[in-house]
Regions:
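Short beta-strand/loop motif that positions the catalytic acidic residue
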Residues: 100, 106-108
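Active-site nucleophile elbow and catalytic-triad environment of alpha/beta-hydrolase enzymes
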Residues: 60-61, 76-96
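Acidic beta-to-alpha connecting loop that harbors the catalytic carboxylate
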Residues: 110-112, 138
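Secondary-structure capping and boundary motifs in well-ordered enzyme cores
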Residues: 7, 66, 73, 96, ...
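Alpha/beta-hydrolase-fold enzymes
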Residues: 1-64
Length: 184
């Protein structure tokens, strides 16, 4: 309800986006590069300065989210994520998971700064029957699970029991999906 916190949503997205990618990737892509034709050295206090390329990149992602996502809904989703606790009222994590009877597949990105691999191992160890954690090797941080399609494909194919090549998406289909995701 009420006015949407659009500026705050864009800023939150800028900050969050720095955790979706690894420091190594951001350094490789942007380093200390200035926007073309701009100097990042300001004259005096309060005088405008040029911007770094990373700032434009982050602004772009902030503006993109504001255009496609309701800011108040974003607040509600964030609250749900922050307050969720599978063990609440059930004791420890192991006690909460003790009666699960599904098959689990757990994967982690080695450079993820949102969901650290050790947390995935903790989850796997808390299951009634521990399962291995598949580690996705990526220089892309959290978004590695979106970018490292071949690794994720193998993990999912094994989990679904469709490890033969005919059951996996074709290269052309993967390229179409990648292009679609870039234009969203």
């Amino acid at each position: 309800d009420g006015p949407a916190p659009l500026t705050g949503l864009a800023l939150a997205r800028r900050i969050a986006h720095t955790t979706y990618r690894s420091p190594a990737e951001l350094e490789h892509r942007f380093g200390r590069e200035e926007n073309r034709g701009e100097s990042t050295v300001g004259g005096s206090l309060g005088e405008p300065r040029g911007r770094y390329a990373i700032e434009s990149y982050l602004d772009h992602h902030g503006a993109k989210l504001v255009e496609r996502f309701d800011a108040n809904s974003y607040l509600a989703v964030n609250e749900a994520l922050i307050s969720h606790d599978v063990a609440r009222g059930r004791g420890t994590l192991a006690q909460a998971l003790a009666h699960t009877d599904c098959e689990w597949t757990i994967a982690a990105v080695n450079t993820d700064r949102l969901f650290f691999p050790h947390e995935s191992h903790r989850l796997a160890e808390a299951l009634p029957t521990p399962v291995p954690v598949d580690i996705i090797e990526s220089n892309h941080g959290h978004d590695g699970f979106l970018i490292e399609a071949k690794q994720v494909e193998k993990i999912l194919a094994r989990a679904l029991g469709v490890e033969d090549e005919s059951a996996t998406p074709s290269e052309a289909q993967r390229e179409r999906e990648a292009l679609d995701s870039m234009t969203r």
